[in-house]
A protein has these predicted regions:
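Thiamine diphosphate
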Residues: 2-163, 314-543, 552, 564, ...
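Terminal amphipathic helices with adjacent charged low-complexity linkers/tails
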Residues: 67-68, 261-355, 614
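Residue-level marker for buried hydrophobic side chains located in beta-strands
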Residues: 166-167, 195, 394, 516, ...
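Intrinsically disordered, low-complexity segments enriched in small/flexible residues
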Residues: 170, 279, 365-366
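Short acidic, Gly/Ser-rich segments with clustered Asp/Glu that frequently serve as metal-coordination loops
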Residues: 171-177
Length: 695
């Protein structure tokens, strides 16, 4: 770890300092006006954020989505005013009235930064540590994108080279997800990642001595990061010169991510509130805000005071952005001229289009043969990988079980890794046993853009990922989770590994599409539909979770209506259906066998396979009624999990064959038999439903 003296080339004027203090005043006033929020960190971090946005980062405030920009992630999302004040000062589109409406209905400045809501916000943060993992994912995506389009360029010479900056607080680094992601970043030697730690020693319960005593800098050194600690000024304020020097030094270290520890005083320079936990999540109070303004030379009677000189000075970021962009555009055009085929491929990817003929590469599976849907998914991924180069991903150390290896000869690993398949631009990601970080890194990869990401683990371990999965839905991100071993059918590993509540729980997340295909051909159609929904023509992206079997299941004729989420797999014979059997995944073949028994008894029975409730609900009412006729009240839903999903579909006369308790350690076939997932039990439930419907 280095602690460098300040020998900076930073140009820092009185107007720069006044702009920093203006950001502090705006943060204090915004929280005071609404009566709640987090003023302290936004006040103390103002010099660091200002230095990044005004002196360091390559960005164009006139076009926040410029592909050549550096990325900024505020992992400490509660300190959203740290970001909002800089977006306002730099001219990203926020105005003073937006800061005045902080945390109010319909404003552009919600309590925590929200991707897609506020221009210039790169990711939704708030749950602590998520942003750290998002930033790691962005840095990974930048490297993979470079490998797709400009792998031969010298370090720092490609138009695809840029930095990812992240500000994290004490709470972020206490969360387990940041440990997982930071370990991954060090292992991957992500030299394009710079993490600035706001080391203010304050948490909600007081000094961080209440919960933390480790040496965080040594921890990051152990992860393989380049670590620097910058000292504050004698008065306790952050030193922009020292921060600038540390960032510039970090940018020169290309074989490791960089960690910069900034010792700060929360709510500096508030005379009474600084260095207190009260300043973390509460308004300072009118008297303290006024006193703070006096300390900095502002009129205590004015609110939201921004001088013309300050805003004129900070809005020069627009001119700087245009100049930086002009330099980049020249390099980008030279790359295009030198690489016309790659440029054409880049244009396709940037437009969100898929290669011509990609659908033809998806295999069709032979009927009758028992194939595990996880195995089918693996074959489909490899087929897609041959024609969709931007598709990449991996597993949380379960690749052989999840069947997620898209290319066995190409692992995403840094130069110098001893494994023979190691390639800095490889396609197969080894996320390690870090499920939570994997999901959040996938979010970062999707946010970065220009690649298509998937990641796998057992369905039961989706619990480890849940917060990041929820955020992927909140942000409408096109990520795909490959969750295998999706029921008691996994067998002997027992109830710790057998998902029971998971399907219903995941379906409860708004905007997440859970897809549980019945067989290999439904799996193929599901992958095709997922990729189709990733294209820009489809509109807003959505995350998908594939729930796949460990065990083999019968393969049926492919039916394109599987892409609608629910369809008639087998129609009733001998008249209109008296009962409809609805099933998903490995239970579909149980419903099919039950239909055969019912038909043999003269009961016309329809089987509906419903791989995705969410896709089905997106169809028009006419289609849904054609699959589940309102006139047929006798219905049975069959799924090896809790039955919460199915009450609305079966109605008062319906029955649900479900699993309302944990599983057990035994062969999967034995468990299906013991827990009632048999043709006989489903047929019996159907007869009960028919009787109930006739009452």
């Amino acid at each position: 770890m280095s602690t460098k003296p300040t020998t900076t080339d930073l140009e820092w004027t009185e107007l720069d300092q006044r702009a920093v203090d203006t950001a502090r005043v705006l943060a204090a006033d915004a929280v005071q006006k609404v009566g709640n929020g987090h003023p302290g960190t936004a006040m103390s971090l103002a010099p660091a954020a200002y230095t990044l946005f005004q002196k360091v980062m390559r960005h164009d405030p006139a076009d926040a989505n410029w592909v050549g920009r550096d990325r900024f992630v505020l992992s400490a999302g509660h300190s959203s005013l740290t970001l909002y004040t800089q977006l306002y000062l730099a001219g990203f589109g926020l105005e003073l009235d937006d800061l005045k409406s902080f945390r109010t209905w319909g404003s552009k400045t919600p309590g925590h930064p929200e991707y897609g809501h506020t221009t210039g916000v790169e990711t939704t943060t708030g749950p602590l540590g998520q942003g750290v993992a998002n930033a790691v994912g962005m840095a990974m995506a930048a490297r993979y994108e470079r490998g797709l389009f400009d792998p031969e360029a010298a370090e720092g010479e490609s138009p695809f080279d840029h930095f990812v900056y992240c500000i994290a607080g004490d709470g972020c680094l206490q969360e387990g997800i940041s440990a997982e992601a930071s370990s991954m970043a060090g292992h991957q030697k992500l030299g394009n990642l710079v993490l600035l730690w706001d080391d203010n020693h304050i948490s909600i319960e007081g000094d961080t001595e209440t919960a933390v005593s480790e040496d965080t800098c040594k921890r990051y050194e152990a992860y393989g990061w380049h670590v620097q600690r910058v000292a504050p000024k004698p008065d306790g304020d952050l030193d922009p010169n020292a921060i600038y020097d540390a960032i510039e030094a970090a940018k020169k270290v290309t074989d490791r991510p960089s960690f910069i520890a900034m010792r700060s005083i929360i709510a500096w320079p508030a005379p009474n509130a600084q260095n207190t936990e009260a300043a973390h999540g509460s308004a300072l109070g009118d008297d303290e805000v006024a006193a703070t303004k006096r300390v900095m030379g502002f009129d205590p009677e004015q609110t939201f005071e921004v001088s013309d000189e300050v805003i004129g000075h900070t809005r020069k970021a627009l001119e700087k952005g245009q100049a930086a962009r002009a330099v980049w555009e020249k390099a980008y055009q030279q790359w295009r001229d030198n690489n016309p085929e790659r440029a054409a491929e880049y244009d396709r990817v940037a437009k969100g289009e898929l290669p011509k003929g990609w659908e033809e590469k998806i295999p069709v599976f032979e009927t009758g043969k028992g194939v595990a849907t996880r195995a089918a998914s693996g074959k489909i991924l490899q087929a897609l990988g041959a024609v969709v180069p931007e598709l990449w991903g991996g597993s949380a150390d379960l690749a052989g079980s999840n069947n997620t290896t898209i290319d066995k000869t190409s692992s995403f690993l840094p130069a110098g890794n001893p494994l023979p398949e190691a390639d800095p631009y490889g396609r197969t990601i080894h996320f390690g046993i870090r499920e939570h970080a994997m999901a959040a890194e996938m979010n970062g990869i999707a946010l970065h853009g220009n690649t298509r990401i998937y990641g796998g683990t057992f369905l039961v371990f989706s619990d480890y990922m849940r917060n990041a999965v929820r955020l992927s839905a909140l942000m409408h991100l096109p990520v795909t989770y490959v969750w295998t071993h999706d029921s008691i059918g996994l067998g002997e590993d027992g109830p710790t590994h057998q998902p029971v509540e998971h399907l219903a729980s995941l379906r409860a997340i708004p905007g997440l599409n859970v897809v549980r295909p019945a067989d290999a051909n439904e799996t193929a159609i599901a992958w095709r539909e997922i990729l189709r929904r990733w294209t820009k023509e489809f509109g807003k992206g959505q995350p998908h979770g594939l729930a796949l079997t460990r065990q083999g299941v019968p393969t049926y004729e492919p039916n394109e209506d599987a892409a609608k989420g629910g369809y008639v797999l087998f129609e009733a014979e001998g008249g209109e259906p008296q009962v409809v059997l609805i099933a998903t995944g490995s239970e579909v073949h149980v419903a099919v066998e039950a239909r055969e028994a019912l038909q043999a008894d003269g009961v016309p029975t329809r089987v509906v396979s419903m791989p995705s409730v969410e896709w089905f609900e997106q169809q028009d009412q006419g289609y849904r009624d054609s699959v589940l006729p309102p006139s047929v009240k006798a219905r049975v839903a069959v799924e090896a999990g809790i039955g919460l999903t199915w009450h609305k579909y079966v109605g008062d006369a319906g029955r649900i064959v479900s699993l309302e308790h944990f599983g057990a350690s035994a062969d999967g076939k034995v468990l299906f038999q013991e827990f009632g997932f048999t043709a006989e039990n489903v047929a019996s439930a159907a007869r009960e439903s028919i009787a109930a419907a006739q009452r």
